[in-house]
Design a protein with these regions (language model features):
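Intrinsically disordered, compositionally biased, charge-dense segments
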Residues: 1-47
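Disorder-to-helix initiation segments
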Residues: 38-55, 113-120
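Alpha-helix N-cap/helix-initiation motif
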Residues: 41, 48, 71-74, 78, ...
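Short amphipathic alpha-helical segments with heptad-repeat character
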Residues: 46-49, 53, 79, 86, ...
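A structural signal for well-ordered alpha-helices, especially hydrophobic packing surfaces
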Residues: 49, 56-63, 89, 93-96, ...
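Helix-loop segments that flank and shape redox-cofactor active sites
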Residues: 55-80, 138-139
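Conserved alpha-helical segments that form or flank metal/cofactor-binding pockets of metalloenzymes
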Residues: 72-103
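Acidic/histidine-rich alpha-helical segments that form the ligand environment
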Residues: 108-162
Length: 165
């Protein structure tokens, strides 16, 4: 083999290595984009989690302010929610973070005073709309199941507020 053949082979080998490296870089980039696609818009997830975290304190405020007809049943229903939601949201966020990384974009919201059981019912209906709209920000079945459990608690609370006096 002459010197030119060796040089050509060497250049071909370098080109092949560069092309493989570019392909690997593209695959890594595509995998990163796929992970983002699987995750969905994290801002929707962040908002849902922020609302759920806020709901614990908001419902506790409603609980402490209950008064009037049917207030004991409402008081106990609201207590069941704010005591139950903490562990559910904590588990949901930890599961999400184990797969996708830390949630860091939390929002805070103003608190409302207790006005009536009807206002509490309206609050839970609005919260459910947010959960329903934002839950598709994650596709994983185990995260969807955890969101189902949150909605289960929400609807159980709504039942108690509407029908138990």
């Amino acid at each position: 083999m002459n010197k030119k053949d060796l040089s050509d082979r060497f250049l071909d080998e370098i080109k092949r290595n560069l092309m493989e490296q570019e392909e690997d870089d593209e695959e890594d980039e595509n995998e990163s984009e796929e992970t983002q696609d699987e995750k969905g818009g994290s801002s929707d997830f962040d908002e849902m989690i922020s609302r759920l975290l806020h709901s614990q304190t908001q419902v506790h405020v409603f609980h402490l302010g209950t008064k009037g007809s049917g207030s004991y049943a409402a008081h106990k229903a609201l207590q069941g929610y704010y005591e139950g939601i903490d562990g559910l949201v904590d588990g949901l966020v930890e599961s999400y973070q184990g797969r996708y990384g830390l949630v860091t974009n939390y929002d805070s919201y103003e608190m409302d005073k207790f006005e009536s059981v009807e206002k509490c019912i309206s609050y839970f209906n609005d919260l459910n709309k947010i959960i329903t709209e934002k839950r598709d920000s994650v596709k994983d079945s185990y995260l969807q199941n955890q969101i189902d459990t949150v909605q289960e608690l929400l609807f159980s609370t709504l039942y108690k507020l509407k029908f138990l006096k």
